[in-house]
Swiss-Prot record:
A zinc finger (PHD-type) spans 416-485. This is V(D)J recombination-activating protein 2. GO terms for biological process: B cell differentiation; hematopoietic or lymphoid organ development; immunoglobulin V(D)J recombination; lymphocyte differentiation; protein-DNA complex assembly; T cell differentiation; T cell differentiation in thymus; thymus development. Zn(2+) 2 binds at residues 446, 453, 479, 482. GO terms for cellular component: DNA recombinase complex; endodeoxyribonuclease complex; nucleus. Disulfide bonds: none annotated. One of its GO terms (molecular function) is histone H3K4me3 reader activity. The keyword Nucleotide-binding does not apply. It comes from Danio rerio. Core component of the RAG complex, a multiprotein complex that mediates the DNA cleavage phase during V(D)J recombination. V(D)J recombination assembles a diverse repertoire of immunoglobulin and T-cell receptor genes in developing B and T lymphocytes through rearrangement of different V (variable), in some cases D (diversity), and J (joining) gene segments. Keywords: Chromatin regulator, DNA recombination, Metal-binding, Nucleus, Zinc, Zinc-finger. It is found in: Nucleus. PANTHER family: V D J RECOMBINATION-ACTIVATING PROTEIN 2, V(D)J RECOMBINATION-ACTIVATING PROTEIN 2. Component of the RAG complex composed of core components rag1 and rag2.
């Protein structure tokens, strides 16, 4: 085992606890970014690239017929292998949005197309569920099982908000364990059935679920009602019979006391379990090998990598599996002054390094690294023994890598800034305060200072009526740090210069005809018409 520090290249602000890593068709994608997606990556999904000790993210696009997928923290993730003409995909259920709303939708994420110019397009499909639909939750697990030629999903555990009838202003954000029911989801028709087993008496969350054929094993977990982490192992056997499924549950007591752990696959139904917590204030620093076969579960302790002092002394850590026996671990940055990067990243490897990297193309007199070669035009690009999609990350192009410096500067007009020393707006736990707010907090402009600055109306303790009044008239506002007077000066009205109206001249207008007549003719004509 080895531990390698990584340097996040202009992407550290996107990572947050509760994110997910998806190993799809040989590529790894990051899902569940911090905050709502921005213009540079509206999908909120990034391709993960680790090379030469650097962590880079690349924005991924969706196909035109894709459904909207919000960024979700702590969802249930399941990998669906390609079978019966169906492509390889990931199933995503539940999770928390940046507004702390819980999702009850089921999404299917797959690769739609690959281009020769290193571009991957994903397709997201929202699956409609009917029957006993699982409620919105987070911290649960989703597993794919195969029994008697059929495929289904097993959903178990999680936390959710209190029922609407019991939810008040005081306990609005209070959560509890979901009922200990097991849900079976038919992926073809979206039918859901709930099953209550006598062996499962308490709900749990943040456990590890490992599936093999028609069995699912639940390791660890946290029971919120009793605030305990039982060291038990739950074996769930599912038979998808023609009439109704049969579920058999067995409770074993040789499990692990662990929550929020990372399961990194190292072989066929072989995993390394590490990370997470064994108590409220203690991380679990050990590594455990878990193997699944026809007999059952085999667990062995493995020597962990040599953790750094930053990891050992950090109170929290999180991460995800990169596939192929590797994982990504992040810890919060600590120090005085505060480091510019919010997190430190490490790559953990559980497999022995090979003597040399196998390359599909190379020459003894030339470099085998594709980054050392000048990029070819599309018309002259040649592939020797390689598929076009295998060159997906063969080179790093400046324009293809996500750079948070390319985003709009939100230091002055951003919604999630720290507007004052007592700022109450946290993008992770923010909820609408005013009736006019939907996805962003209401802000008001303070006219004091060099160029003025924006502050949150909630932090300034502005009543909603006064906020609406200030937004409708032309009054200046000064924040609490600059006097705290809602109305002190009136913005002078804009002086409008009078418009000078110049009469228009007609270009083709003719002067009236003047007749020269003698007085005798005038007298004759006057008598004639009289």
């Amino acid at each position: 085992m080895s531990l390698q520090p990584l340097t996040a290249v202009n992407c550290g602000s996107l990572v947050q606890p509760g994110f997910s890593l998806l190993d799809l068709e040989g590529d790894v994608y990051l899902f569940g970014q911090k905050g709502w997606p921005k213009r540079s990556c509206p999908t909120g999904i990034f391709g993960v690239r680790i090379k030469k000790g650097e962590l880079k993210l690349r924005a991924i696009s969706f196909s035109n017929n894709s459904s909207y997928l919000p960024p979700l923290r702590c969802p249930a993730i399941a990998h669906f292998e390609a079978q019966d003409g169906k492509p390889e995909c990931y199933l995503i259920h539940g999770g928390r949005t940046p507004n702390n709303e819980l999702s009850s939708s089921l999404y299917m994420l797959s690769v739609d197309s690959r281009g020769c110019n290193r571009k991957v397009t994903l397709r997201c499909e929202e699956k409609e569920l009917v029957g006993d639909v699982p409620s919105a939750r987070y911290g649960h697990t989703l597993s794919v099982i195969n029994s008697r030629g059929k495929t289904a999903c097993v959903l178990f555990g999680g936390r959710s908000y209190m029922p609407p009838t019991e939810r008040t202003t005081q306990n609005w954000n209070s959560v509890g364990d979901c009922p200990p029911q097991v849900y079976l989801i038919d992926l073809e028709f979206g039918c859901c059935t709930a099953h209550t087993l006598p062996e499962l008496t308490d709900g749990q969350s943040f456990h590890v679920a490992l599936a093999r054929q028609d069995c699912v094993y639940f390791l660890g977990g946290h029971i919120l009602s009793s605030d305990c982490r039982p060291s038990r192992l739950i074996r769930l056997h599912v038979e998808l019979l023609l009439g109704s499924p049969v579920l058999t549950c067995t409770i074993l007591h040789e499990g692990l006391t662990i929550t929020s752990a990372i399961a990194s696959p190292i072989g066929y139904h072989e995993y390394i379990i590490f990370g997470g917590y064994q108590s409220e204030t203690q991380k679990r620093m050990e590594c455990t090998y878990v193997g699944l076969d026809d007999v059952g579960v085999h667990m062995e302790s493995r020597e962990p990598p040599q953790w750094t002092s930053e990891i050992s002394h950090s109170r929290t850590w999180f991460g995800g599996s990169l596939g192929k026996g590797t994982a990504l671990v992040a810890i919060p940055s600590e120090g005085n002054p505060t480091p510019p990067e919010a997190y430190h990243f490490y790559q953990v490897s559980f497999q022995k390094e090979q003597d040399g990297e196998a390359t599909a193309q190379g020459c003894s007199q030339e470099s085998t690294d594709f980054e050392d070669s000048a990029p070819l035009e599309d018309s002259e690009e040649l592939y020797f023994g390689r598929e076009p999609h295998e060159l997906e990350y063969s080179s790093d192009v400046e324009g293809d890598t996500y750079n948070e410096e390319d985003e709009e500067d939100e230091s002055q007009t951003g919604y999630w800034i720290k507007c004052c020393l007592s700022c109450q707006v946290d993008p992770n736990i923010w909820e609408p305060y005013y009736s006019t707010e939907l996805t962003r907090p209401a802000m008001i402009f303070c006219s004091r200072g060099e160029g003025g600055h924006w502050v949150h109306a909630q932090c300034m303790e502005l009543p909603e009526s006064l906020l609406l009044q200030l937004s409708q008239d032309n009054s200046k506002y000064f924040c609490l740090d600059h006097g705290g007077l809602p109305k002190q000066e009136m913005t002078p009205p804009k002086q409008m210069l009078p418009v000078k109206r110049v009469p228009m001249k007609m270009t083709h207008r003719k002067a009236p005809v003047s007749l020269k007549m003698t007085p005798a003719k005038k007298t004759f004509l006057r008598r004639l018409f009289d």
